[in-house]
C-alpha cells in the first residue's frame, strides 16, 4: 500500500472551511483510485492528509487530479502543502 502524506498549514480559523470543502469533494476524491482519504486536525491550524492507494501506479496516476484538488484549497491554506509519497507497510483495520 502507498500513501500521499501531505502536511498543510491553514490560514487562522480556516480548519472548518477546509473540512467542509473536502466533504464537498468526496465524489471527486473517490474517482482518483484511492482506498482511503483521511484528514487529521493537528491543532493550531495544521493538518495532515493521508490518501491511501493500493499501488504506486495508482498513486502516480492520481497526481494531476491531486494537484487540481489542492488548488481548490488555495483560499484556506497559508503556505504550499508539503506532499510526500510514502509506502505503508502496515494498515490494520479492526
Feature-to-residue mapping (PLM):
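Short S/T/G/P-rich N-terminal loop/turn motif that feeds into the first structured element of a domain
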Residues: 1-67, 75-94
Amino acid at each position: 500500500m502507498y500513501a500521499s502524506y501531505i502536511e498543510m498549514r491553514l490560514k487562522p480559523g480556516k480548519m472548518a472551511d477546509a473540512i467542509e470543502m473536502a466533504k464537498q469533494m468526496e465524489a471527486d476524491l473517490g474517482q482518483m483510485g484511492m482506498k482511503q482519504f483521511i484528514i487529521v486536525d493537528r491543532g493550531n491550524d495544521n493538518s495532515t492528509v493521508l490518501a491511501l492507494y493500493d499501488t504506486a501506479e495508482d498513486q502516480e496516476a492520481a497526481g494531476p487530479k491531486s494537484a487540481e484538488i489542492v488548488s481548490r484549497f488555495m483560499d484556506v491554506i497559508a503556505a504550499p502543502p508539503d506532499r510526500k509519497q510514502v509506502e505503508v507497510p502496515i494498515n490494520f483495520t479492526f
